Regions:
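Core catalytic region of metal-dependent phosphoesterases/phosphodiesterases
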Residues: 3, 7-9, 14-19, 24-109, ...
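Beta-strand-turn-beta hairpins that frame and shape the catalytic cleft
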Residues: 8-17, 128-136, 185-189, 217
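Glycine-rich phosphate-binding loop signature in dinucleotide/nucleotide-binding domains
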Residues: 11, 36-41, 129-131, 164-167, ...
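Conserved beta-strand scaffold positions in the cores of enzyme catalytic domains, especially
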Residues: 18, 71, 171, 190-192, ...
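Active-site environment of divalent metal-dependent phosphoester hydrolases
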Residues: 23-28, 52-55, 76-82, 143, ...
Length: 270
């Protein structure tokens, strides 16, 4: 894990990989990192939320180190580092918060002091210039670490103002768990990379990450096939909620549904 307190980074050229929250899914994270390297990625970035949802959160850190993945802090990471009582996910519905709390309590109990110290060093964002475009990597949005940028809820005008206020041409975010991107009328680009640790509520067991390839300013979303059944069994061994395990095995969300806007929820099973 590369800790850059300033959030500055050298300007990476060539193909780079952008990964959303691992959510303790160490099997998918490793599969995505290996796939990105095979595809020629010269730099890998993770947009935070290392823990939550999956089992044995400590298995994430060696993978970040092994592949040299530069990482920023998500709301989960900030909460764990500061020993807050909850994940600060930004949910408002009691059912969403109930499952979020069960996930957070499990992760909190299994996070060591050494790991908390690592999380405390993660920068909130990373900025760099690539092919004359100013790029910002953040977790939720430039305004709030837990702001949800849903495709159906974000107008062009809102996104253009968001990028303009952040002084960037390309904004890369995560937090929602569902990947999407949009080129704006003024040339700005919003890329939400979703999450590498959980399916995108699309009925597929694969998870997703994004590639920014040399010569392109738009992302290509890459599905990650991994041994989801081994992860599901590990989750069961750790007595994680059956609803979480079902999502891994089916690709459909069973929790954190109430936060979804109507259009995003209509694409799912529940």
């Amino acid at each position: 894990m590369r800790f850059k307190g300033s959030g500055a980074y050298h300007s990476p050229q060539g193909t780079i990989a952008l990964l959303g929250g691992p959510y303790s899914n160490h099997v998918a994270l490793r599969a995505a990192a290996e796939d990105a390297r095979r595809r020629g990625a010269v730099a890998l970035f993770c947009l935070g939320d290392l823990g939550g949802f999956g089992p044995n959160p400590g298995k994430i850190y060696p993978i970040l180190d092994e592949f040299g993945i530069s990482t920023i802090a998500g709301n989960y990471d900030q909460s764990l580092a500061e020993r807050r009582p909850d994940c600060g996910c930004g949910y408002t519905h009691p059912r969403d918060n109930e499952y979020a709390q069960r996930s957070y309590d499990y992760t909190d109990r299994r996070t060591t002091d050494i790991e908390r110290a690592k999380l405390a060093k993660l920068p909130p964002s990373i900025r760099f210039t690539r092919a004359n475009r100013r790029v910002l990597l953040c977790h939720g949005s430039p305004r709030r670490v837990n702001e949800f940028l849903w495709e159906s809820a974000c107008s062009d005008a809102f996104l253009m103002r968001l990028l303009r206020d952040a002084e960037v041409d390309t904004l890369v975010c995560s937090h929602t768990g569902i990947h999407w991107q949009r080129r704006l009328p003024d040339g700005g680009i919003l890329i939400n990379v979703g999450a590498v640790g959980r399916p995108a509520n699309d009925g597929r067991t694969e998870t997703w990450y994004a590639l920014l390839e040399e010569g392109s300013d738009e992302a290509r979303f890459i599905p990650v096939a991994y041994d989801f059944e081994s992860l599901a069994r590990e989750m069961e061994e750790e007595s994680l909620p059956a609803e979480f395990v079902e999502t891994i095995r089916t690709g459909w969300w069973t929790t954190c549904l109430e936060i979804l806007p109507a259009k995003e929820r209509a694409r799912g099973r529940f």
